[in-house]
From Swiss-Prot:
Protein's recorded name: Bifunctional protein PyrR
Gene: pyrR
Residue span of motif PRPP-binding: 100-112
Keyword annotations of the record: Glycosyltransferase, RNA-binding, Transcription, Transcription regulation, Transcription termination, Transferase
Subunit structure of this chain's protein: Homodimer and homohexamer; in equilibrium.
The EC number(s) this enzyme carries: 2.4.2.9
GO biological process: DNA-templated transcription termination
């Protein structure tokens, strides 16, 4: 059951614009930067960030797609034959010696990010890995923090954050729901 909308379309747009500026500022431009979205919604957020960065800097940033299914420590079985549902990774550029900016919708326990870092390291040795998230809800189980955060939304363990994006859900909003 939905309790509250914490970000509407305008708030998401503003947060992504701010994150784009922060990425440019922290990296002193975008030379050597690549964006890698964590499937599913992280991909769309990475694409939106790339658009904003291009508008600001006038240069495009490569965007890749990362499927971390086989890297998770809590491998969930999502098909009838109990095999993991693998969606495929598409990172059409080298990550070695690049500043890889992982992009995801929600930072919670840190386990997804840990799995994403393992997946990136299997592709090469980046100069640096940074993390951009739309929402940080706390409750970390691993020592991971985001470099770029759209909004901090403290939650209880009985709540979940639901991110809806137009590309997937037909609407842009972030809301808190009861489990």
């Amino acid at each position: 059951m939905q309790k509250a909308v914490v970000m509407d379309e305008q708030a998401i747009r503003r947060a992504l614009t701010r994150i784009a500026h922060e990425i440019i500022e922290r990296n002193k431009g975008i030379d050597g930067c690549v964006l890698v979205g964590i499937k599913t919604r992280g991909i769309y957020l990475a694409r939106r960030l790339a658009e904003r960065i291009e508008q600001i800097e006038g240069t495009s940033v490569p965007v890749g797609e990362l499927d971390i299914t086989l890297y998770r420590d809590d491998l969930t079985m999502k098909t009838e034959d109990h095999e993991p549902l693998v969606k495929g990774t598409n990172v059409p550029f080298p990550v070695s010696e690049q500043k890889v900016i992982l992009v995801d919708d929600v930072l919670f326990t840190g386990r997804t990010v840990r799995a994403a870092m393992d997946a990136v390291m299997d592709l090469g040795r980046p100069a640096r890995i940074q993390l951009a998230v739309l929402v940080d809800r706390g409750h970390r189980e691993l020592p991971i923090r985001a470099d770029f955060v759209g909004k901090n939304v403290p939650t209880s363990s009985a709540e979940v954050i639901v991110v809806e994006l137009a590309e997937v859900d037909g609407v842009d909003q972030v809301s808190i729901h009861e489990k």
